[in-house]
Each structure stands twice: as C-alpha cells, then as structure tokens.
Amino acid sequence: MNPLKIYLGLALVCWGLASCSEPTPEQLFAQAEAAAADTTSLDKAVNQFNSFLERYPQDKLAPRALDKLALIAQKQGDMKGAVVLYERLLSQYPQSDQVDEAQFMIAFICEEFLGDLEKARQAYQRVIDQYPTSELALSARHLLPNVGRPPEEWVRFQDAPRAP
C-alpha cells in the first residue's frame, strides 16, 4: 500500500474528528445567547445555558450564564425560580461582576412580584452593606425605606415647567 495514501487517509480521519469536537465555552455560550434573544426559543436557551454550566462550571462566563437563566425565568413568569438562580449565582460565584445586580434583583423580585417584604428589605440591605460602591447601592438606599409603599407615596416628580 502506498504510504502517501495511508498518510492522507489518516489526515482526513483526524480532520474529521477535529471538526466533530466539542464546542468551546465561548461558542456554546454564544449559541445559548442567540437562542435567548428569540422569545420563541427560550426553552432551548435554558437547555443550552444549563449544558454550558454542566460542562464549564468554572469558566469565566458561568456567572453570566446563571444571570441569563434568571432573566429567562423572569421572562417566563417564574419569579421564584429567578430568585433561586440569583441566589445560586451569589453562592457559587461570589467574586463575579454580577453579584451586586443579582442581590438587587432578589430584593426587587421579592418586593414587586413575591410580596416578601422582609426578604426584600434584607436583600436591599445586603446590596448596601456588601457592595457599597456599586451604582445599585445608591438605588437600594433609596428603595429600602420605601419597601412596601406604593410609588405615588414616595416618588417625587419635578413639576413640569410652566409656560409664562
């Protein structure tokens, strides 16, 4: 048998196997993000983000995957599920860039959708205490004393300028 044919055959087999390799973390995350952008494929996005987290739990994109899953849960009306996902993000990735937002969203969802005012107060206080330099800490400072009150009682709008 011709050694060149053997070499070319092996090269083709190796190339074929390489093209069937597992997607990179970035590729899998991008596929999930694309699915999440289409409201008709949210279940597909959930499966892809969960697959990403199973395969790459220590990847730098893992906290963002949990954040995206929480956002999808909110879109689907599963507010308790969203809180669970945000809590998971806080416990598994406490050093990530998403923690202040996750803590804030727990507070917001607990107040606005679940009616758990005590948990909302605690979550807003954690934003203030644990992330004092976050832009969301300023919002939490404003919202905390008003938890449970209707906005019309505490939101002050500037009077519209009056024509002379």
Regions found by a protein language model. Name each.
Residues 7-14:
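Sec-dependent N-terminal signal peptides
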Residues 3-4, 16-164:
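Acidic, polar-rich low-complexity tracts and alpha-helical solenoid repeat scaffolds
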